Amino acid sequence: WNTYAFFVLYANIDEFDATKYTLEYDKLSVMDKWLLSKLNTLVKTVDDNLANYKITETARVLDNFVDELSNWYVRRSRARFWVKEMTQDKINAYMTLYTALVTLCKAAAPMIPFMTEDIYQNLVRNIDKSAPESIHLCDFPEYDEKLIDKELENDMEEVLDIVVLGRACRNTANIKNRQPIGMMYVKAPEALSDFYIDIIEDELNVKKVEFTDDVAAF
């Protein structure tokens, strides 16, 4: 609900209308592509789970997706919504988040019928009167295998693991996140790309992150 409220707040300020834009995959940032990959993986998993009556597993994957959507994608992307001009990057952020919210609601509607209906009425019916009158009259979303990038998902998962461990190390050493650290070593056979390293450095307030498979010196 907080992510939905975030979207509505800035969409109202910018008078953003999703029907006036299309989601152009080739123009998206890595974060956008990651979210769309996770979204399509979610739809695929939920569809399979519901077909096999795995209700608990369905609730768990929906909860995990909402957590990553709110606490990772939105938090890492919110500055894009603060830009005054309606740049292509800002449009991409709006369209990616809009697509995620609407698709998530359709996938979660059997589990959360009233909240998803409320969100659907505002995000979809409010701007498209030709859309089905209720979210429960919509087709269940279909996943697009071409948008699922497991390598991207795995790399971002590694980033999330490193950030969580880094925060735990800071807490153990009683070093607040606002205090910068000169160097952080990560034990791994291969280094991540600079894009991911930049995220780690920003999240943990570290000047430099170095990947090494040899930790004998430490």
Question: Can you name each region flagged by the protein language model?
Answer:
Residues W1-F218:
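Feature 926 captures the class I aminoacyl-tRNA synthetase adenylation module centered on the KMSKS loop
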